[in-house]
A protein has these predicted regions:
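N-terminal segments that cap or nucleate solenoid repeat domains
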Residues: 23-65
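Start-of-repeat signature of ankyrin repeats
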Residues: 26, 59, 92, 125, ...
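Ankyrin repeat domain, specifically the short helix-to-loop turn at the C-terminus of the second helix
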Residues: 46-51, 76-84, 109-117, 142-150, ...
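Bacterial N-terminal signal peptides that target proteins for export
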Residues: 1-10
Length: 532
């Protein structure tokens, strides 16, 4: 009797196991059929007892897969068989969100009719309307709003709305549709970006036009003070910059980079302002020009629209870095490493520093003062002669600006009235250590000089010729010598240009300039000056 009961139990267990196996097999076949978009196989699996809401281990149901595959017929078949339109994966991804992301209004309609929630959210807080806005299908956007989707809902992580997402992707038709149904054009993300600023940052021309037509502020700025105009410029979107100016952007709008004019001058010749970490993330360096408007053309447009050609770069200076041998950059723009502050520098000064004679000529055409120095008394001629030259980062032979171009800038600065023997003026202070000692290191009291705010304190009372030695561009040295540069001029430390050629500690590296030394020695001998 016991053996008979045992046999019956085993048989029953086997039958139950077989039934479960058959059902699981049918479920697997259903999912496989949906993924391969085989409608006949889908119907057969359902007939064989497959669970219509069968799901993968991550909770993705057959209906979700059908929506992902954009297959309306299979979606219809599954819904007809009783599939739950609201079933979500373990990541809270729903069939509606997937269909909206695909921009499939027909499937979205089926799902909504079957009970899907127009305001359901993913695990990240993204709504179906946000997904549709990213895709850009205006019909899907309209449908969701008409069926109750909240148009101004923001996802919780970055605070972005559907309009921000549509604008950033350049989905102009979706932008128009959202605006038609009351999307807030002035909403801000947690990072301080509006739909308009997202569109500008991503160079979405049609979205920009649509947003401006619906009340976006063309002079809007981020929380750090970056204007839409400057955002366009520092991303290389000069065509967008021109568009914004045509739409009424203020060419003199306040900006932490000094001005839009300063920014476009840097973008025209950025040098290589990238340290190792930045290069690892962006080996191509600064943004390249996009569109058919050049930096020079945009600079002209800025000036024609009334940009102040003599505006000065003013920002809170921080101390000189003894460890790096550099002074601080202005905020929100990477100008590379340098020895002298940009504080007080005009657009003309910066163009001269970049060796950019065409830009210098344009600025003078619009009444720029070609002689205004920075706060440390560094003149445009000194800047052009490369007094603040950081090899490999300042615009120069290694970063796209030839020595001939820089020489042209030097000649132009001199022709426009700069004093060839003017000296920098960092104020009065004492540096401890003999001149020869300070060629190889900083003054012994350097720690007391870090807050002075002008740059490397050893650069006080330098001339343009001192600068030409630092860059080791010998044609510039020769030009200055030929045009009356004082050969035995001494800076505050006591260095003459010739003394510097013997070897100079800059940015934690020791450099010698033998070719330049030869030019200076010969010239000094001709003038009867003592040669060290």
């Amino acid at each position: 009797m016991f053996k008979t009961s045992l046999r019956l139990s085993v048989v029953t267990l086997l039958m139950l196991t077989s039934a479960v196996f058959a059902a699981n097999l049918a479920d697997t076949r259903l999912l496989d059929a949906v993924k391969s978009e085989n409608l006949t196989a889908v119907k057969k699996a359902l007939e064989q007892g497959a669970k219509v809401d069968a799901a993968d281990p991550d909770g993705s149901t057959a209906l979700l897969w059908a929506a992902q595959r954009n297959n309306d017929e299979i979606v219809a078949a599954l819904l007809a068989a009783g599939a739950k339109a609201t079933a979500a994966s373990r990541f809270n991804m729903t069939p509606l969100a997937v269909a909206a992301s695909n921009g499939n209004a027909k499937i979205v309609t089926r799902l909504l009719d079957a009970g899907a929630d127009a305001n359901s959210v993913s695990k990240e807080g993204e709504t179906a309307l946000m997904s549709a806005s990213l895709n850009g299908d205006a019909a899907t956007v309209k449908l969701l709003i008409q069926r109750g989707a909240k148009v101004n809902e923001a996802e919780p992580y970055k605070g972005q709305t559907a309009l921000m997402l549509a604008a950033g992707e350049g989905n102009a038709k979706a932008v128009e549709m959202l605006l038609e149904f009351g999307a807030d054009v002035k909403a801000k993300s947690k990072g301080g970006y509006s739909p308009f600023l997202f569109a500008v940052r991503n160079r979405q021309t049609e979205a920009i036009k649509a947003l401006l037509a619906h009340g976006a502020n063309v002079n809007e700025a981020t929380t750090d003070g970056s204007s839409a105009l400057s955002i366009a410029i520092v991303n290389g979107y000069f065509d967008i910059g021109a568009l914004l100016l045509d739409k009424g952007a203020d060419p003199n709008v306040a900006d932490p980079r000094g001005s839009a004019l300063h920014a476009v001058i840097w973008m025209r010749r950025p040098g290589a302002p990238w340290e190792a970490a930045a290069l690892a993330e962006d080996p191509e360096g600064p943004p390249k020009q996009s569109g058919n408007v050049t930096a020079l053309e945009l600079a002209r447009k800025l000036l024609e629209k009334g940009a102040n050609p003599n505006v000065k770069w003013e920002f809170k200076e921080q101390r000189f870095s003894k460890s790096l041998g550099t002074t601080r950059n202005p905020p929100n723009i990477n100008l590379g490493r340098h020895y002298i502050t940009f504080n007080g520098s005009t657009p003309f000064y910066n163009a001269a520093r970049n060796g950019d004679a065409p830009m210098m000529k344009l600025l003078v055409e619009f009444k720029a003062d070609p002689k205004t120095p920075n706060v440390g008394g560094v003149t445009p001629l000194m800047a052009a002669a490369a007094l603040d030259y950081y090899e490999g980062e300042t615009p120069g032979p290694y970063t796209g600006v030839s020595e001939a171009e820089r020489l042209e800038a030097v000649k132009l600065a001199l022709a426009l009235g700069n004093d060839i023997n003017a000296r920098t003026n960092f104020g009065e202070y004492q540096m401890l250590g003999a001149p020869e000692f300070q060629l190889k290191t900083y003054p012994t009291n350097m720690d007391q000089l870090l807050d002075m705010g002008y740059g490397d304190p050893r650069f006080n009372m330098m001339t343009a010729l001192h600068g030409a030695v630092i860059s080791n561009q010998q044609s510039i040295v020769q030009f200055l010598v030929d045009n009356g540069a004082k050969l035995d001029a001494k800076n505050q430390v006591g260095w003459t240009p010739l003394m510097m050629t013997k070897g100079l500690f800059l940015a934690n590296a020791f450099k010698e300039f033998p070719g330049t030394a030869k030019i200076l020695r010969e010239a000094m001998i001709k003038q009867g000056l003592p040669v060290e």
